[in-house]
Amino acid sequence: YNDLRAAGVVMLDQDIMLTRLQSKIDIRVHIPNDIGRLTESSEVQDQAPCYCDWQLYKTLNSHGIGSSKAETQHLDNIVELYQNAIKHDQLQGLPLIAYYPAERFVNEMNILSKNNPLIFQSAHAYEISAIPFTTFSRFFEWLREVSDIENAQIAQLFQQLLCNPSLQKNKEPDFLQHLLHAQKQMHSPHLDALKQALTTVIPALEDLFIQYQPKLQLMVRYQGKSMLYQQLSNSVKNWIALVGDIVRRLCLLNPNSLYPCLEGDGILLIDAIDHQLDQNTAQVI
């Protein structure tokens, strides 16, 4: 929650107990070995250098108005450690920190928006909204962008094969064989990670893709049938969007990884994970 009266993520005024004037949150995270350690100057006297601590405060004044304070020196230091680690290792990713409230639903699928360079910035993986619900709008925008990139790669690959003089002299089966072989060699780690994660969590879901012609729409292959995403039950739609948005965040934080879902790490909080799921789906979560 971003309080306009103070910089940073802080607490709500109503989080303070009725008989108290102040609330405090202590946060401690373990620093991975490959990131480094806090310098001696940034440590408190009895704190291990492999841990990073910071505190959030909210204090009520005499008028009942809360003022916020955050002690984030160690947090700033660990951010610097990650920045230095990424400079020395391009495969180094950032940790996932995400929270999904209990109210999760698909309001609309924004797959019309495109060519937004901000979609792939790692900062978009850390969005934490003050509103008490999630609509997964960022996931659908991201899905459109990565699908467009894959289609552009396939079109370029097809054009290169068409312009290959040696293939022009061969028969059609030879051309199709080369096309299939070249497509297998093409890497699309973001879409591959998405589809693998969805298939793992929802085995009945065979594919999720954007259909461009004759009309732009989101399609699925579910239980052996091709259908519109909107035709799925609310339970399945929400679960696809939730898994997809987690994958989106991991891909943004591990942009150079071929397996972002397997190599990424962090903290993921899902409130009432079985909320709005049907009985059969809730039993296997």
Each predicted region: which residue ranges?
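Glycine-rich, flexible loop segments associated with nucleotide phosphate handling
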Residues: L21, P49, L179-L191, P260-D271
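Amphipathic alpha-helical domain-onset/packing element
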Residues: L94, F136-R144, E150-Q213
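P-loop NTPase switch/coupling surface
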Residues: Y1-I154
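Glycine-centered tight beta-turn/hairpin loop motif at sheet-sheet or coil-to-beta transitions
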Residues: I31-I35, P203, G224
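Aromatic-acidic/polar surface patches that form glycan- and anion
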Residues: I16-L18, D89, Q183, H187, ...
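Hydrophobic, Leu/Ile/Phe/Ala-enriched alpha-helical segments that form helix-helix packing faces
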Residues: I78-D89, L194-L205, I246, L250
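Switch/communication elements of ASCE P-loop NTPase nucleotide-binding domains
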Residues: Y1-A7, A197, D207, Y212-I285
